[in-house]
Amino acid sequence: MSNAATVAAVSATENTTAAKTTATFDVREATAADWPGIWAVLEPVLRTGETFTWDRDTTEEQARAKWIKEAPGQTFVAVRDGVVLGTGELHANQGGGGSHVANAGYMVHAAYTGQGIARALCAYSLDAARAAGFRAMQFNAVVESNTTAVWLWQSMGFRILATVPEAFNHPEIGYVGLHVMYQKL
């Protein structure tokens, strides 16, 4: 779940998983050549430990294994002039009888927040989830103190189903809740 969210509006696009273009960046499926740029986004977000439940010392190899998804999931990027500004990933939230519900995560490089990138990544993933036949999307662990992300996901139709109290140990403010958020597709 994104937690490096932004709140700026993004131009409307068709409901398709094809590459989407905004006034200033494109969102498209990631390629192997995008990995260095994806890692440049992931690493600082993970190291701060404020918005994702990953270990702060996650290695590049571990991150790649966890972030890069296979169909029906996918990994995607927001790019401008060949520079990866942000990235997202989409996958089934559970296996078996729960595999019809999607889960996604998003990260935006700190230098590019406030440009509508997280909104565009989320919109892309919602379209991709619909196209892949998912019936809903669930975010399992939106950090309660990440109010920008919480606001953004709510503005995009997600609702908070529950909050697990003190489930996240924020490195600066201590224990905070994790929201479970949901949207029917």
Positions of the model-derived regions?
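Conserved GNAT acetyl-CoA-binding A-motif
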Residues: 129-142
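Terminal substrate-recognition subdomain of acyl/acetyltransferases
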Residues: 2-23, 106-107, 164, 170-185
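Helix-loop element at the rim of GNAT/NAT acetyltransferase active sites that forms part
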Residues: 40-57
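A short beta-loop-alpha structural element at the N-terminal edge
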Residues: 26-38
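Conserved acetyl-CoA-binding loop-helix of GNAT-fold acetyltransferases
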Residues: 114-129, 151-155
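Acetyl-CoA-dependent GNAT
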Residues: 13-16, 29-32, 55-111, 122-124, ...
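Conserved acetyl-CoA-binding loop of GNAT-fold acetyltransferases
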Residues: 154-164
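Conserved beta-strand-loop-alpha-helix junction that forms the acyl-donor binding cleft
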Residues: 113, 139-149, 167-169
